[in-house]
Amino acid sequence: MVLSDAEWQLVLNIWAKVEADVAGHGQDILIRLFKGHPETLEKFDKFKHLKTEAEMKASEDLKKHGNTVLTALGGILKKKGHHEAELKPLAQSHATKHKIPIKYLEFISDAIIHVLHSRHPADFGADAQAAMNKALELFRKDIAAKYKELGFQG
């Protein structure tokens, strides 16, 4: 799967909006993930106690983790598909330490699309959404390949 230069530009244009508030976007995305797929919360020992959206919004740790997640994803997206060096340690930790199933990466991808659309409707139309979906699918496909190399059946 390859994105065109125009598709990558759409992805990076919306990502510039994310970078204006990485932690806030990340927190919103994690809240959307946890509300839509409560089973994902079980993978996060330090967030398991957060039961309500208000508790999640008040959590500085959740905001920090959202910042970490989106900072890593931004670094990967900026590589425009040439993300082998960035992907390897991420796949290693997510497969061997955290044991995050690929399905959960699909869930967070959906949360990313939803939050970007809700926060930036004028800048995240159908073309940009399609490009971001394609970029996230490429990321998941490449992570899945690394998982397989590591013997993780996520």
UniProtKB/Swiss-Prot annotation:
- Protein name as annotated: Myoglobin
| Amino acids binding O2 | H65
- Phosphothreonine occurs at T68
Describe the family membership recorded for this protein in Swiss-Prot or TrEMBL: Belongs to the globin family.
Q: Which InterPro entries match?
A: Globin, Globin-like_sf, Myoglobin
What residues does heme b bind to? Answer: H94
- Extra info from the record? This sequence was the first determined using the Edman sequencing system.
- Subunit details: Monomeric.
What EC number(s) has UniProt assigned to this enzyme? Answer: 1.7.-.-, 1.11.1.-
Q: Which residues form the Globin domain?
A: 2-148
Reaction(s) this enzyme catalyzes, per UniProt:
Fe(III)-heme b-[protein] + nitric oxide + H2O = Fe(II)-heme b-[protein] + nitrite + 2 H(+); H2O2 + AH2 = A + 2 H2O
Biological classification of the source: Eukaryota, Metazoa, Chordata, Craniata, Vertebrata
Q: Name one Pfam family in it.
A: Globin
Q: Where in the cell is it found?
A: Cytoplasm, Sarcoplasm
Q: What residues does nitrite bind to?
A: H65
